[in-house]
Amino acid sequence: MKLTRIQKEKWIPLFAAGLVVVLDQCAKLLVGAYVPTNTSGVRVLGDFVRIVHVYNVGAAFSIGHQLNQVLRTLVLGIVPLIIMFLIVFSYFRTDAFCPVQRWAVSGIIGGGIGNLIDRFLRPNGVLDFIDVKFFGIFGFERWPAFNIADAVIMTCGLLLIISFIKQEKEISSQPSCNETGGVFRT
């Protein structure tokens, strides 16, 4: 079966999503096996980057860690699972995404799946292992530990926002139908 151009534009980025899941889970397995829990970890770039082994039962920045287990499962497991389903559903239902947006959404899907695997299969929470010095910015001497899935979600989310803003500016700079007599002229 030969894929059409549109089908390729939808499916090829999803292989990247799968790659994100594999890299994230393999890195977590390695960290879990070789880095002791709750220590200063392994220095990678001096004191700037360290590989640590910590668990986060909350969301980003441990938000929601104080919730009881039932609420935590609902708010941090079931709700994100529903959101992930809606993202995947809209990914396949629309042809409105440009290629950059498809790649960005695919990265978000891959990162989301990586963290959901931890959320449901790791009783201690999501394994975070990248620890970066932040020089006191926003009051953080070190940025809260994160993982590959988190990094991909944030990077792709930012890329998606920038692409939507750029797309909106391009659309708003085109003359309206009233100015061109119902025909777009560029």
From Swiss-Prot:
Q: What is its EC number?
A: 3.4.23.36
Which biological process, per GO, is one annotated for this protein? proteolysis
Top-level taxon: Bacteria
| Keywords linked to the UniProt accession | Aspartyl protease, Cell inner membrane, Cell membrane, Hydrolase, Membrane, Protease, Transmembrane, Transmembrane helix
Question: What start and end residues bound the annotated signal peptide?
Answer: none
Q: Cell inner membrane as a keyword?
A: yes
Bilayer-spanning residue ranges: 11-31, 44-64, 70-90, 145-165
Q: Report the catalytic activity.
A: Release of signal peptides from bacterial membrane prolipoproteins. Hydrolyzes -Xaa-Yaa-Zaa-|-(S,diacylglyceryl)Cys-, in which Xaa is hydrophobic (preferably Leu), and Yaa (Ala or Ser) and Zaa (Gly or Ala) have small, neutral side chains
Coiled-coil regions, chain positions: none
What is a single cellular component term in the Gene Ontology annotation? plasma membrane
Q: Active-site positions, per UniProt?
A: 128, 150
Q: Which Pfam families match?
A: Peptidase_A8
Q: What is its main location?
A: membrane
State the annotated membrane topology for this chain.
Answer: Multi-pass membrane protein
Where is this gene product found? Cell inner membrane
Sum up the protein's function in the record's words.
This protein specifically catalyzes the removal of signal peptides from prolipoproteins.
Q: Which family does it belong to?
A: Belongs to the peptidase A8 family.
- Which NCBIfam families is this protein grouped with? lspA
* Identification of the protein by name: Lipoprotein signal peptidase
- Which organism is the protein's source? Treponema pallidum (strain Nichols)
